[in-house]
Amino acid sequence: MVTQTKNYETGVVRPEPVITPPTELRVPHLGGTARFVHPSQGPNAYGAVGKAILEAGQAVPTGDYTASLLAGAYLGTNRDEPEFKNVRELMISRWLWVFNRNLWIPEGVYSIEDQESLGRSQPLNVNDLENMLKGGKDFNGIRFSQDGRTSFAPKGSYKLGEHTPESLAKDGFVIANYGVEGAEKLGEVVSTFGRNPKTFGVEVAEGNEPELRVSAVD
């Protein structure tokens, strides 16, 4: 018996790809408005995410801007919008890179905005940081440069580990990274979590070399 195999021509209708333009999220920020682009870059390493943001012609989110974004996502009147829900999902599933470089020394921690996404690729020098802080302002012992981009929190002004929302908002390390207003916003944000937040850093012993780290929040 001869069996014939019939060839059937099947056609698959492929829909045209839908290109969704980026959505702009606007949140209150330091008396004005900050704008963020959705969808976000990543997931990827700190440097890769920063590079992608900069190549897109955008600015990387430093601590104060990140605090404003989170306040919008958790506390804002538009927090039920899909884009803000996505921010909360990222906080649960991964983390958000915060483009600040932190240099830990025995006496405390320096924080400087990482607007070029250098991360740990280039060292920071204590003398250079001190020069940046000259002529700046002081808030409860935490020093800020005139432009607000560099800060120093002395040991004793911060505690690494578990916090209450209230203690987080007053923590020197948090204030150095996110600013006074940003730290207050983070305190309000974490009060919605149902669990106490934790901060992580480096304890550098006397006589040891400084330790350079970057920031993230989750």
Model regions and ranges:
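A binding-site-centric feature that preferentially detects glycan-recognition modules on secreted/surface proteins
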Residues: 1-59, 65-218
